[in-house]
Regions:
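N-terminally biased helix-coil "hinge/interface" segments that flank
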Residues: 2-706
Length: 706
């Protein structure tokens, strides 16, 4: 019998560390385990990672040699910033002479980086500067020794225009490494201009290097000790994974990897290709975006400082499953941000009904400095409970029995009755007021994300994960007129995301009017980075984006740690694909038809609100593209330029002050690439990079979307 192959994903949350083991071929869950997150252990959260991993191996009889992939997300970097557990950073700045040197010296000189003003947490920064022509080994060593004598733990090498030539930074790196001092090169972290921001990003990275290297070593040796020999991968904040050796150089990339894990779970496991994604915990709700199979990404802010680190664009709201309710004599004032957990109270809907006798209102401030209008209910037996969002949703009958948030609606009613009486309304009206307060926060967040990422309301749906999902998602979806989905295994979706994550690397440069050669070089650089991060060369795909306004060109390489000879994920047939798109097209749709199919894709069209709506489904049942107004055609590669030009003119929308040109999706082989640019030549440039080397007689599918 052929040995099974197992993927293991471990997600480190604020309260629990959860491990999931999945079948590599079918993605079925073999087993799951959770332990309390080990914040206070001397090995930090790594202890919990290893514990849950070993439990999973033992409890589900997994042979360590069957494990082909093991990865974990980490809160270690984020916690280090929050708790101020950071090293002192010494910056060695380098620049030429004259005016350039004078300006660069000022830009390179960083002050201490404040992480939390209230409690005075900061990264201590020491500075030194070397003129480029004085850069000798002797001078570099003198500067390193001087910084170390002043208390430096870790070095940053940063040069003006260092992204164009890394030799000087590399020289400092090599000499510091010989002295066993951890070192970061600024142009290794990002290839973007902006000397101060690049140096600051490198300094923030350097500040957590010693701590993260110790954690990496502890985790790796424990995983090796369990008999697993495959590389240990770490989740990045942008939703990819990288090998632990890469993490030792660039630990800052792992900041915010918790929210990233849950978005990737939605993307890979739920096949969500266009969705607003919710992870509803007890205290906070993370909201992010998936558009055409890609999560929304932005630069991370750390301690309020802008960096050049890509992370998933996730908004964090202080209203969740366990949020407490604030009241006045006349109305519901607000819901959250404090949760029942903080006040040390049980949820009313999880309290036995018979205990709720003679409930009395008490108004408290859960933490010092909080307003004293948070509502707690004192029972006759002396116990204090809270009614929360989860209780309100149960009262309104919105939580199906199968969901984690399902509780006793009668218990919640009894606890809410005194407050309803005080406000002169029914319990149902009180529950509605509570959820309306959440809806105001959630809907404005969804609207701003939809605007930023140009999401089409008709194609949007809400995907709810986390234990508290059923408390908020059904209510908000109904009020916004959107479909929603709360999947099976929603409470371990983050661990699933880690287990299924791909290797990812991003290279960005500022290149005004890039040539085909420039983009080829950038693509190759992204491929090399992904290989260094652990991707198999044959599995790598590269997506290129050009920002015409800033001249920034971004190459995003994704790949897996192995190439699968056969993929046993169930093939999706025409019948199943039709069902998927019929559900996805939603209401008010007519004339659904399969307009093009080949051995890799199904392309469906339908009429909705007078427009031609399009969906592209791959053979695994992923809806890869959703367009609310588009035109579909097919042609041979030798003719693609004429077709693209024709659609460029025919599909253009002329408005009083501008012309809206189409974006293109092209299906070639097993891939779909999307192209958007403000001029046709740039579109050709990008398409030619993908199609230029393929057989001119190959048939491709082109979708032009407005």
């Amino acid at each position: 019998m052929e040995k099974r192959k197992v993927r293991m994903g471990i997600d480190v949350g604020g309260t629990y560390t959860k491990c999931v083991a999945m079948d590599n071929e079918t993605h079925e869950i073999i087993g799951k385990d959770q332990v309390k997150t080990t914040h206070d252990d001397k090995a930090g959260v790594a202890a919990g990672v290893v514990q849950s991993f070993r439990n999973c191996l033992k409890n589900f009889n997994i042979d360590p040699s069957d494990v082909v992939f093991v990865a974990h997300s980490t809160t270690q970097a984020t916690n280090a910033f929050i708790e101020g557990d950071v090293a002192n950073v010494g910056i060695i700045g380098i620049a030429g002479g004259g005016l350039e040197g004078f300006l660069a010296k000022r830009q390179l000189r960083l002050k201490d980086i404040v992480l939390d003003e209230k409690v005075g947490r900061m990264i201590k920064v020491l500075n030194t500067f070397i003129k480029k022509k004085q850069l000798t080994d002797e001078v570099i060593n003198q500067n390193i020794d001087e910084l170390v004598s002043q208390g430096t733990d870790v070095i940053v090498a940063s040069m003006a225009f260092g992204v164009d030539s890394m030799e000087e930074e590399q020289r400092i790196h090599d000499l510091a490494s010989k002295k066993n001092i951890p070192v970061t090169m600024a142009s290794d972290i990002t290839k973007l201009y902006g000397l101060t921001r690049r140096t600051r990003t490198a300094a923030i990275n350097a500040s957590i290097l010693p701590k993260m290297m110790a954690t990496a070593n502890a985790t790796e040796s424990s995983v090796r000790g369990a008999g697993v020999s495959v590389p240990l991968m770490i989740m990045r904040g942008d939703g990819g994974v990288m090998e632990i050796n890469e993490m030792r150089k660039r630990p800052i990339l792992t900041a915010l990897s918790g929210p990233a894990a849950s978005v990737m779970g939605s993307l890979m496991y739920l096949r969500a290709s266009n969705a607003i994604y919710f992870e509803v915990g007890g205290t906070t709700t993370n909201i992010g975006v998936i558009k055409n199979g890609r999560p929304g990404v932005d630069y991370a802010k750390i301690g309020g400082h802008d960096t050049y680190i890509n992370s998933l664009d996730v908004r964090i709201l202080g209203c969740a499953g366990g949020s407490m309710v604030r009241i006045s004599d006349k109305d519901v004032v607000d819901v959250g941000p404090r949760s029942a957990h903080i006040a040390g109270c049980e949820y009313a809907c999880f309290t036995p009904e018979e205990e709720i006798v003679n409930p009395q209102i008490e108004l408290v401030s859960p933490k010092k400095g909080d307003p004293a209008d948070y509502c707690v209910i004192r029972l006759q037996n002396g116990k204090k409970i809270c009614f929360t969002n989860t209780c309100a949703a149960n009262v309104l009958g919105l939580v199906d029995e199968k969901y984690f948030a399902h509780g006793n609606a009668n218990s919640a009613r009894k606890a809410m009755q005194p407050v309803a009486d005080k406000l002169g309304i029914t319990v149902e009206e009180l529950a509605t007021k509570i959820l309306d307060k959440d809806y105001d926060k959630v809907s404005s967040c969804i609207k701003s994300l939809a605007e930023k990422y140009e999401l089409d309301h008709d194609a949007m749906k809400l995907v709810g994960c986390g234990g508290g999902a059923a408390a908020l998602v059904p209510y908000c979806a109904k009020k916004m007129g959107l479909d929603y989905d709360i999947p099976q295994n929603a409470e371990v979706i983050s661990s699933i995301g880690v287990a299924l994550a791909m290797v990812r690397d991003v290279v960005e440069r500022v290149i005004p009017n890039p040539s085909q050669e420039d983009i080829k070089e950038l693509k190759q650089e992204a491929v090399d980075s992904a290989i260094n991060s652990g991707a198999d060369p044959d599995s790598i795909e590269v997506h290129v984006e050009i920002d015409a306004q800033t001249g920034k060109v971004t190459a995003i390489a994704t790949g897996s740690t192995e190439v699968k000879a056969t993929d046993l994920l169930k093939e999706c047939d025409e019948n199943e694909a039709t069902k998927l798109v019929t559900k996805d097209f939603g209401k008010d749709v007519t004339d659904i038809k399969l307009s093009i199919k080949n051995d890799k894709f199904f392309v469906f069209e339908a009429t909705k609100k007078g427009k031609n709506s399009v969906r592209i489904v791959d053979r695994k049942g992923f809806i890869k593209v959703q367009c609310s107004n588009a035109f579909v055609t097919k042609c041979k590669i030798e003719n693609y330029k004429e077709v693209v030009e024709q659609l460029w003119e025919e599909q253009a929308e002329f408005r009083t002050d501008s012309v809206i040109r189409p974006d293109y999706f092209v299906c070639y082989g097993p891939r779909i690439s999307d192209y958007s640019a403000i001029d046709l030549e740039q579109i050709y440039l990008l398409m030619d990079l993908d199609l230029g080397d393929r057989d001119k007689q190959e048939e491709i599918i082109i979708v032009a979307s407005i």
